[in-house]
Amino acid sequence: SSSHRDEKYWLRHIIEGVLALCPQASFEIFGEHEIYKLYRDLPRVSVLHPMTWQNYLAYTKTHRLDIGLAPLLDSGFNLARGPVKFYDFVRMGAVGIYSNRSPYSDFIEQNVNGVLLENDPQKWIKALSVLVNTETKRSELARNAKKHAYSLANQ
């Protein structure tokens, strides 16, 4: 959404770095034309047009990802967020990499059901590259995230 505009700009350097290190990696990002222009020169990056909540929910139920990215930069708006991306990523079978801040820092168990990182682009490039290249770790974290989501739903 447009509320993540700054994060999409912040991610560009990270995505470019991972693409250079991992030729098998590809990325999808939601964004308006401004975001398309920002990413159009990068190979293996698709910019998807924003969609209604109903369509997005259907998309996350039928689309599979390996890794989801949920950076949160400093802003008043981000202070009020819930861990929604965790559930989106679980629906898509993915492990998430999250900024180590609320709401994720109190919700994600580090390297058990997700990865928490400070907002240091080099750390994101390294962690993302490791997960891209380590299918067993990706799968383990995604399985644990799914178990965590189900345990919360059954409380």
Which sequence ranges carry the predicted segments?
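CheY-like receiver
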Residues: 59, 127-130, 148
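Nucleotide-sugar-dependent
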Residues: 6-9, 53-54, 58-91, 97-106
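Conserved catalytic-core segment of nucleotide-activated headgroup transferases in glycan assembly
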Residues: 1-62
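A charged, aromatic-enriched C-terminal amphipathic alpha-helix characteristic of glycosyltransferases
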Residues: 119, 136-155
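Conserved acidic donor-binding segment of nucleotide-sugar-dependent glycosyltransferases
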Residues: 108-122, 130-135
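Glycosyltransferase donor-binding loop in the core domain
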Residues: 2-3, 81, 149-150
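Hydrophobic residues in well-ordered beta-strands that form the structural core
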Residues: 29, 98-99, 116
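Residue-level signal for the nucleotide or nucleotide-sugar donor/cofactor binding architecture
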Residues: 6, 51, 84, 119, ...
